[in-house]
């Protein structure tokens, strides 16, 4: 049983994006002690891309005795690229191709790309096998972006990136298939919270979308990047924690206490 029936201290991070040094600094500052049996680390997806230490991130997390790893859309991009055997332009701009190089211990993009990606996926497979789509405690649900929803009556078939997409709450979200979970990893969670799509009775903790966007939505700041607020954003029974590490050089650590489900 994970955690047993006692209160545990949960240290929650998201969107590490290959920044191992920043992760360790943030956890140390928050008081995380991997030797403490009451301390658990929960990562809300997007462990790789953009930073230059994806292997260090993967090695550190896989060796932690108490952790929960959540799958994000960048893990989806990485798997898709490796299975495809070649990089699309967005894989180059997102840093996914570079992640494969770093995980595969390749210095430069050269040679047989499919071999590079096969090697990277072999090294990453034990890590990927540990990832969940969500994790639930007595009072919280941890996801990368959101839980799977259902299309609303006015849905026009447009995909996740459409700004005017409106969904409805899915009471059977726990039974969603992987395609539905993959779709849920891409939307704007602050917009979904604004549409009152959290009817779970619990607080949804997410990353994916920089928390400054939520603060701007609430009128706490005027811009998402200039003079922005990067602290966790509490909004309609949700908490957004993505600090946009590639921009800020920092990672938020949300520390909460809760009981695991029996």
Located regions from the model:
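Active-site neighborhood of divalent metal-dependent phosphoester bond hydrolases
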Residues: 37-38, 54-138, 168-171
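Short beta-strand-to-coil "C-cap" segments at the C-terminal boundary of structured domains/repeats
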Residues: 255-259
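Flexible, charged surface loops at secondary-structure boundaries
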Residues: 4-6, 34-36, 63, 195-200, ...
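Short, glycine/acidic-enriched loop or turn micro-motifs at the edges of active sites
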Residues: 17-18, 49, 75-76, 147, ...
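Residue-level marker for buried hydrophobic side chains located in beta-strands
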Residues: 12, 41-43, 69-70, 141, ...
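Acidic, His/Gly-enriched loop-helix segments that form or flank divalent-metal centers
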Residues: 100-101, 106-239, 244-249, 260
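Divalent metal-coordination and catalytic microenvironments
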Residues: 15, 46, 61, 72-73, ...
């Amino acid at each position: 049983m994970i955690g047993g029936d006692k209160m545990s201290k949960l240290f929650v991070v998201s969107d590490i994006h290959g920044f191992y040094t920043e992760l360790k600094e943030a956890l140390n500052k928050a008081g995380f002690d991997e030797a403490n049996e009451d301390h658990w680390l929960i990562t809300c997806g997007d462990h790789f891309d953009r930073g230059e230490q994806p292997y260090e991130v993967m090695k550190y997390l896989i060796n932690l005795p108490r952790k929960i790893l959540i799958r994000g859309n960048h893990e989806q991009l990485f798997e898709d690229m490796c299975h495809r055997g070649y990089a699309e332009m967005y894989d180059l701009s997102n840093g996914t191709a570079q992640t494969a190089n770093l995980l595969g211990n390749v210095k430069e993009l050269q040679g047989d790309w499919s071999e590079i990606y096969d090697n990277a996926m072999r090294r990453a497979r034990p890590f990927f096998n540990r990832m969940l789509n969500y994790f639930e405690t007595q009072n919280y649900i941890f996801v990368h972006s959101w839980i799977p929803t259902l299309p609303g009556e006015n849905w026009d078939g447009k995909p996740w990136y459409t700004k005017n997409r409106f969904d409805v709450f899915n009471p059977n979200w726990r039974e969603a298939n992987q395609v539905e979970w993959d779709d849920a990893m891409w939307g704007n969670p602050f917009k979904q919270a604004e549409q009152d799509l959290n009817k779970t009775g619990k607080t949804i903790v997410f990353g994916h979308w920089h928390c400054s966007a939520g603060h701007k939505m609430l009128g706490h700041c005027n811009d998402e990047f200039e003079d922005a607020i990067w602290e966790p954003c509490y909004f309609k029974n949700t908490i957004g924690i993505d600090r946009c590490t590639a921009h800020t050089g920092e990672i938020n650590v949300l520390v909460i206490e809760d009981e695991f489900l029996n």
